[in-house]
């Protein structure tokens, strides 16, 4: 009997060991950060995301996942490029998507941030930098007449979403594999750019190319973001297909050819756009704050598409690109061609935040009597907010208290979570999802009356 118990115990231990071995640890650093940095234990590197001062929390995006961190304003240290009045102001100054390093401590099963460092601008000597105005002149001349070699050293996936005209893609992480693609003339002007002022890939490329003996290399520090604020970019037909169409990434695809010609063959999803009707188009165009990717198509990728794209950029849109070679290049690449009637109205719906519930779905469920929902409405606002009204039947747990009150949350029911503006609800979503709860969150704003009625923005 004792032997049988011992064998069972050993087998159980073996199973636990195998399960532990199979559970791969979560990455502490975004892949792009590993190009230039190592991450010490107790640290995270990624992109700053939502900030919820009401619950003393923020989240960091690490590739396709999120980490939720708590903080105490009395003890948290925040380092930003520009000084701030206090911790709250410093955190608010960090733009969404900005690269950060966070040092944290584990307390009661939660990560508590003790240091947040916003990545500062890269340091490039004045003689090693090229400004926007000089780059504009060179791009207008072209590589042959301007005698330059422009390199986009971002990862290929980013390059395919749009690049500075005339650039070639030599990603910094694969620099050593692409040495043979550099100019034979080691005195030729080589210009590197990447993802902007905080990106180390172009300075890193500069250092490597200098070590190979190239004497005339520079960095466009503002990178693709700096170019896109002033000018249109370009992308090839295969890039359009791979980066947007195959992945079903929302975009605005504008065909500026005459309707009669375009209807004989166009890229699926295209909307016809009259080059003389920009003012009318902008009245129904998605708001610039949504940052819709825009691709403009004409017959050859020539002046017609370029002029139309320039007008969109001047109207405040970034991420505007011209299809290199136009529709002819699309056909030459043997890519799918649609015929018939093009769209006439621009419709752009940003990709929903992972885990979000649509406003219509939330409204439909929350409007039902609590006994008919079959769903838990979780309100994670603070008591000073919920005292003025809650959705009838909602479970109220302030977001900072979630981990201590898990026993109140059912594991066998769907949970729809909300706060007042979506930020704390998303923090709650990531915390509970990681624990196995069936949860979604409302990403937008909601106003709840004392009667329990609610209005969605």
Where are these regions (language model features)?
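Rhodanese-like catalytic fold shared by cysteine-dependent sulfurtransferases
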Residues: 2-4, 21-138, 157-192, 196-252, ...
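Short, solvent-exposed interaction modules
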Residues: 149
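Bacterial N-terminal signal peptides
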Residues: 8-17
């Amino acid at each position: 009997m004792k032997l049988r118990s011992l064998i069972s115990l050993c087998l159980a231990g073996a199973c636990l060991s195998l399960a532990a071995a199979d559970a791969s640890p979560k990455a502490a650093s975004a892949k792009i950060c590993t190009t230039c940095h190592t991450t010490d234990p107790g640290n995270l590197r990624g992109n700053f995301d939502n900030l919820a001062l009401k619950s003393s929390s923020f989240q960091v995006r690490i590739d396709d996942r999120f980490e939720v961190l708590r903080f105490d304003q009395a003890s948290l240290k925040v380092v930003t490029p520009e000084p701030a009045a206090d911790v709250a102001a410093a955190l608010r100054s960090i733009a969404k998507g900005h690269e950060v390093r966070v040092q944290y401590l584990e307390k009661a099963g939660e990560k508590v941030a003790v240091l947040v460092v916003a990545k500062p601008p890269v340091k490039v000597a004045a003689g090693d930098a090229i400004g926007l105005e000089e780059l504009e002149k060179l791009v207008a001349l072209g590589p042959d007449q301007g005698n330059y070699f422009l390199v986009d050293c971002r990862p290929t996936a980013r390059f395919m979403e749009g690049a500075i005209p005339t650039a070639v893609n030599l990603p910094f992480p694969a620099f050593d594999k692409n040495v043979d693609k550099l100019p034979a003339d080691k005195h030729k002007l080589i210009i590197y750019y990447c993802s902007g002022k905080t990106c180390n890939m172009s300075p890193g490329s500069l250092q490597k190319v200098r070590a190979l003996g190239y004497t005339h290399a520079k960095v466009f520090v503002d990178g693709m973001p700096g170019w896109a604020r002033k000018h249109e970019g370009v992308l090839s037909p295969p890039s359009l297909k791979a980066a947007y169409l195959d992945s079903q990434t929302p975009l605005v695809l504008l065909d500026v050819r005459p309707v009669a010609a375009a209807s004989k063959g166009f890229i699926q999803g295209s909307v016809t756009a009259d080059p003389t009707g920009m003012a009318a188009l902008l009245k129904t165009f998605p708001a610039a704050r949504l940052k819709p990717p825009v691709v403009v198509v004409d017959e050859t990728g020539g002046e017609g598409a370029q002029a139309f794209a320039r007008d969109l950029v001047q109207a405040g849109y970034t991420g505007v690109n011209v299809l290199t070679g136009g529709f002819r290049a699309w056909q030459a690449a043997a890519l799918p061609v649609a015929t018939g009637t093009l769209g006439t109205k621009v419709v752009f719906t940003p990709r929903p935040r992972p885990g979000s519930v649509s406003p219509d779905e939330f409204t439909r469920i929350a409007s039902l009597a609590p006994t008919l929902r079959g769903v838990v409405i979780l309100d994670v606002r603070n008591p000073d907010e919920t005292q003025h009204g809650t959705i009838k039947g909602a479970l109220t747990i302030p977001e900072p208290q979630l981990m201590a009150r898990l026993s109140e949350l059912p594991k066998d029911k769907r949970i729809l979570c909300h706060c007042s503006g979506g930020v704390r609800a998303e923090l709650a979503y990531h915390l509970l999802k990681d624990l196995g709860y069936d949860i979604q969150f409302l990403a937008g704003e909601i106003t709840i009356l004392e009667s329990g009625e609610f209005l969605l923005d």
